[in-house]
From Swiss-Prot:
Protein's name in the database: Cobalamin biosynthesis protein CobD
GO biological process, one term: cobalamin biosynthetic process
Biochemical pathway: Cofactor biosynthesis; adenosylcobalamin biosynthesis
Similarity comment: family membership: Belongs to the CobD/CbiB family.
Length: 326
């Protein structure tokens, strides 16, 4: 870690908070994650066929290791380039980091669910939530739509904001790009479907490992956000529920931020859900909380989320400030 990395991170968090992922920009340019997806798709098409489970698993291991190595190499090259460019390189690096963060874009997508419910009722909420979750929206009633939006916000706070920021802080651009490649691979091939059970095994397991520290850190950031927006009791509940109920989730990591958000808002989250016609039967997280979530709870979740993001930026700034004053 270096002080410059934290300074870049603070600037990147501010840029992402203010600008996000504007449609006008990415309609004209290709987002880097799209290139990651295309690279993963090439390996998937070439190697994920015509072999037994053991060979497919080995091919999947080779695939993700090659992709991670390529990402790290790209990060090293960009580091060298930005170092040579001096102040311009600093700005370009901050913009690059901001591209891989998801504060404003995530909040905007989640807010659209509340807006959809208020303007077009259940169908409006279902349409908006279908853009951010994989579950079947037709199976969701209004509280289910609200829970799905809040769960997505909490989970993606961990792997869309905290994890990329953490891996950048630990290993610079190589760490950030490797994490984003791994996370993209997990979303594309890390499923337990027959097609990817073996080929995507390594990507899924490595993604679980890479997200482990961020998921735990996100609990304290959500608790801090709850403290600033909802008081001490909400912050305490966020930590208590996360410690108690995180294991109710099928994911080893997603349960931490989702349980923290459930405690912060005093609502129930997770529970039985339908994905592709298959019901995932899990207990409710924070079962003692309110059973009926509303659009107002989505607004409250976004407020806590933004305070948590502010806490992350402030913590990074605190690490930098003493050196700037020397």
């Amino acid at each position: 870690m270096s002080i410059e990395i934290f300074l870049v991170l603070v600037v990147a968090l501010i840029i992402d908070r203010l600008v996000g992922d504007p449609d006008w920009l990415w309609e004209r340019l290709t987002h880097p994650v799209v290139f990651f997806g295309k690279a993963i798709g090439v390996f998937d098409e070439a190697l994920n066929r015509g072999a037994d489970g053991g060979w497919l698993k080995m091919r999947g291991v080779a695939t993700i290791l090659i992709l991670l190595a390529a990402s790290i190499l790209l990060g090293v090259v960009l580091n060298r380039l930005f170092d040579v460019l001096g102040a311009v390189g600093f700005i370009l690096e901050a913009i690059t980091v901001a591209v891989f963060l998801a504060q404003k874009s995530l909040a905007d997508h989640v807010r659209r669910v509340a807006d959809g419910l208020r303007s077009n009722g259940l169908e409006g909420g279902r349409e908006a939530v279908s853009m951010i979750v994989g579950r079947d929206p037709k199976t969701l009633d209004e509280p289910g739509v609200c829970r799905a939006a809040i769960e997505s916000l909490a989970e993606n706070f961990s792997d869309g904001v905290v994890a990329p920021a953490l891996w950048y802080a630990v290993a610079g651009l190589p760490g950030l790009l490797a994490y984003k490649m791994l996370n993209t691979a997990d979303s594309m091939i890390g499923h337990k479907s027959p097609k990817y059970l073996h080929f995507g095994w390594a990507s899924a397991r490595l993604d679980d490992l890479a997200n482990l520290p961020a998921a735990r850190l996100s609990v304290f950031l959500i608790a801090a956000g709850a403290r600033f927006k909802r008081g001490v009791e909400a912050a305490k509940a966020a930590i208590d529920v996360a410690k108690r109920d995180h294991g109710f989730h099928r994911s080893p990591n997603s349960g931490w931020p989702e349980a923290a958000m459930a405690g912060a808002l005093d609502i129930q989250l997770a529970g039985p859900r339908v994905y592709g016609g298959v019901t995932v039967d899990e207990p409710m997280i924070n079962g003692a909380g309110r059973a009926i979530a509303t659009a107002d709870d989505i607004d409250a979740a976004v407020a806590v989320f933004y305070r948590a993001c502010t806490t992350l930026a402030a913590a990074s700034a605190v690490l930098v400030l003493p050196f700037l004053l020397l």
